[in-house]
Amino acid sequence: MTTPLQITLHTKDGYLLAATHYPAPGDQFIVIASATGVPRGFYRRFAEFAQARGVNVVTTDYRGIGDSKPATLKGFDMQYADWSTLDLAAAVDYAATRGKVWLVGHSLGGHAIGQLPDANILQAAYVCGAGAGWHGWMPRPERYRVWAMWHMLGPIGTRMYGYHPMSKFGGGEDLPMGVYRDWKRWCALPHYFFDDPEAKVITDKFAEVRIPIGAAVSTDDLWAPPASRDAFFKGYANATVDAIDLQPEGLGVKQVGHMGYFRPQAGALLWPQMLAWLAQYGLVQNKA
């Protein structure tokens, strides 16, 4: 396989994002829409899997994350929606100027499609682990742990550091304050930002989305069980949504959870299914 290209994406508001292009022959591109606080390197093995089958893949670190973060997150001014409307949009634009684009999303990636300036530029999207985020959809005791994160650990951590120190709570990368505030507010609502009158500027765009979307969740995903997925994807009223329930035993693993979709244990069976689903909408697999 061709060596990945480390590139810089320029957003519409002038921010510079670290990104990686896994090159393949031809003009087919998959853009990976990362989960909240997850650096692009986490998706490397899936990107290499698709690249080996003749598909270009683009991954990026959103602003404030991974190689796109400033020297300090304290005082870093941004909103959660910037990751979708500006950062993911820059990755899609990069791919769209070079060929046809499909999207593979993880968690936030399912929320981001409807926030893109023009989601209909995508041929189709397959997203994993995207749900409404409300703790009430989660099984016990996860709902109590998440409630404690928002109402106890989060407020203490943000007061101490000026950002959300997720890494100190075993939860991945630290999050900018603007991301924490928006995420906390929307996760308090059963249908996420669709229940927030102040988010109307975001949610109104979802009705414009008319692409096919595969919305896959594992039945053991504590953060995005099927009911949570269904609550959120009602917002894509004019898209063709294919709700896909995955069983860990069907993938030959004991656990998938919220992060296992892009780990190689489950990926051995899941990734071919993902590309096969996208193939219904024009993606062609070839040996790179």
Feature roles, as predicted:
Residues 224-235:
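Short alpha-helix in the alpha/beta-hydrolase fold that links the catalytic acid
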Residues 104-191:
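Alpha/beta-hydrolase-fold enzymes
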Residues 1-22:
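N-terminal cap/lid segment of alpha/beta-hydrolase-fold proteins
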